[in-house]
């Protein structure tokens, strides 16, 4: 069987679908990944994938560039002749679905979060919605990572109800992200935010909450981990972060290929995002490692937290509300914090174990008669 995955970064394919890829390759699937080249392209090749570069303008609507993207995908599909295609993220979902239809190949579209499409009600947003409505007539199914996104598409009549499938996130590897004892570094309590350094991720609210909390709790440490060099109009530059460090309100930890040691030293994972998330992977990873979560009562984010049991939900774009949640956490006893983290791990095990996500992929491929091999992991 030949299978193609298309996304806007090789990084996302490697990091978010690593276990799925391993299982597909183990079952003898000939797997192609089509995405803009980055340092993770080579890692995918090492795994056994055939990787093809796909120049793409990830943001904005440029009819000529987007037509070129669709034609490049159509050429790849006709050359590869795959049995099935899986598209991720906005432009591959739209233009890849159209190219797959023209090539006569069945496909699956997976919406990994709606980003700005339904947040900014402008001309670009309206065009994107109409493109979705046209393109999503053609995939066999469209998967949504949370019920809010699925409901929006149905309410706007952008998709037929029988094609809209709820996935509940892309899952987390529970054997890779496991609870571990926190290193006894000192008596400080560490709040950790892991994300690209974008304003939409609530980074500024995190910093303002840190200012408020540290006036009364000097043992509260606020840490930032993530890339500040991404091409995005919402990005926070290194200079601004350096000013926050100089002020003494946050520590910037840079980037890493393995977040587990940094999660292990934290007491609480925080993501005050107002971006239209799918299901934030960093929150799933933190909860899987038995860390309590503080996040916004926002699309995707709220799905990962049982408010008051596994963490706390704060108001969107409200640093004071976030600070109150942080203070509430600080007043818990050690045993209460541990119980909250343990409850979070149990919640992730019940709802976000990636093995059930992989099972759904295999069931779908068998449903459309493009995969006959048994997946022994679930037999």
Question: Positions of the model-derived regions?
Answer:
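Short hydrophobic beta-strand element within catalytic cores of glycosyltransferases
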Residues: 292-295, 305
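Conserved acidic donor-binding segment of nucleotide-sugar-dependent glycosyltransferases
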Residues: 306-308, 312-319, 328-334
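Acidic donor-binding loop of glycosyltransferase active sites
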Residues: 264-278, 291
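Short His-centered aromatic/hydrophobic patch
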Residues: 87-93, 111
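Nucleotide-activated donor-binding/catalytic signature segment of Leloir-type glycosyltransferases, i.e.
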Residues: 226, 235-255
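Conserved donor-binding/catalytic core segment of Leloir-type glycosyltransferases
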Residues: 183-201, 207-210, 223
């Amino acid at each position: 069987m030949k299978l193609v995955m298309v996304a806007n970064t090789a990084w996302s394919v490697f990091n978010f679908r690593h276990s799925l890829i391993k299982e597909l390759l183990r079952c003898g699937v000939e797997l192609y990944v089509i995405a803009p080249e980055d340092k993770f392209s080579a890692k995918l090749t090492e795994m056994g994938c055939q990787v093809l570069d796909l120049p793409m303008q990830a943001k904005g609507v440029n009819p000529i560039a987007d037509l070129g993207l669709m034609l490049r995908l159509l050429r790849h599909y006709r050359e590869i002749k795959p049995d099935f295609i899986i598209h991720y993220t906005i432009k591959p979902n739209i233009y890849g679905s159209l190219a797959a239809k023209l090539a006569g190949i069945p496909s699956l579209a997976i919406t990994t979060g709606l980003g700005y499409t339904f947040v900014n009600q402008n001309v670009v947003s309206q065009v994107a919605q109409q493109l979705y409505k046209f393109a999503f007539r053609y995939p066999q199914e469209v998967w949504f990572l949370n019920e809010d996104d699925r409901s929006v598409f149905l309410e706007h009549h952008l998709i037929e109800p029988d094609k809209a499938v709820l996935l509940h996130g892309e899952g987390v590897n529970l054997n890779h992200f496991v609870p571990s004892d926190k290193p006894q570094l000192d008596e400080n309590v560490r709040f950790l935010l892991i994300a690209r350094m974008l304003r939409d991720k609530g980074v500024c609210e995190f910093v303002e909450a840190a200012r408020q909390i540290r006036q009364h709790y000097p043992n509260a440490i606020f840490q930032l981990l993530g890339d500040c060099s991404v091409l995005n109009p919402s990005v926070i530059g290194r200079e601004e972060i350096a000013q926050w460090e100089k002020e003494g309100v946050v520590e910037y930890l840079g980037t890493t290929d393995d977040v587990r040691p940094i999660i292990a030293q934290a007491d609480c994972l925080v993501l005050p995002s107002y971006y239209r998330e799918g299901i934030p992977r960093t929150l799933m990873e933190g909860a899987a490692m038995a860390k309590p979560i503080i996040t916004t009562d926002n699309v995707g984010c709220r799905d990962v937290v049982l408010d008051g049991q596994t963490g706390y939900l704060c108001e969107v774009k409200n640093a004071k509300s976030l600070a109150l949640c942080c203070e509430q956490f600080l007043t818990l006893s050690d045993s209460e914090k541990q119980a909250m983290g343990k409850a979070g791990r149990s919640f992730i095990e019940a709802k976000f174990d990636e093995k059930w996500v992989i099972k759904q992929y295999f069931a779908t491929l068998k449903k459309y008669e493009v995969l006959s091999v048994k997946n022994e992991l679930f037999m």
